[in-house]
Design a protein with these regions (language model features):
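Aromatic-enriched hydrophobic runs in primary sequence
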Residues: 4, 10, 28, 36-37, ...
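A beta-strand edge to alpha-helix "cap/lid" segment located at domain peripheries
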Residues: 2, 52, 56-126
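A solvent-exposed, acidic/Ser-Thr-rich amphipathic alpha-helical stretch
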Residues: 19-21, 27-70, 74-76
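Short, low-complexity N-terminal intrinsically disordered segments enriched in polar/charged residues
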Residues: 1-28, 124-126
Length: 126
């Protein structure tokens, strides 16, 4: 059963930007679906090695990336984290998105993480 303490520990790991600390939250063969990518689910990372590489790349591009968690919803071996992510990319672009992660756990390890975020459009497209 997922607890609020476990979710706060995962959030603290992500906000530390310590890749090994974050990867330790995942099961060995976990999947992590990023919000952006070439697939309908974004981009699927499979296993700790792929997750480690993607996070290393992300924090290199956005070294001050941080999440402000606003709400956790817990249900058995699943959880949802609602957040705002902020930071500044190497190109100077400000990151400020609202989103959520849907988690599935085995014990206290993440076996699946699916990330969603709002798309900010600066031009009217309607």
């Amino acid at each position: 059963m997922v607890t609020i303490e476990l979710m706060r520990a995962i959030s603290a790991a992500f906000n530390s930007r310590d890749v090994e600390r974050i990867v330790a939250c995942f099961a060995e063969e976990a999947t992590f679906c990023l919000a952006r990518g070439p697939e309908p689910v974004g981009r699927t990372l499979k296993g700790k090695s792929a997750i480690r590489q993607a996070l290393s790349d992300r924090f290199r591009q956005i070294p001050d990336m941080r999440w402000e968690n606003e709400e956790y919803i817990l249900a058995g071996d699943r959880a949802i984290s609602v957040w705002t992510v902020r930071g500044q990319g190497g190109d100077g672009e400000e990151l400020n998105y609202q989103g959520c992660d849907i988690y599935r756990f085995q014990g206290d390890k993440i076996i699946h993480k699916n990330t969603f975020w709002k798309i900010v459009e600066h031009k009217a497209r309607l």
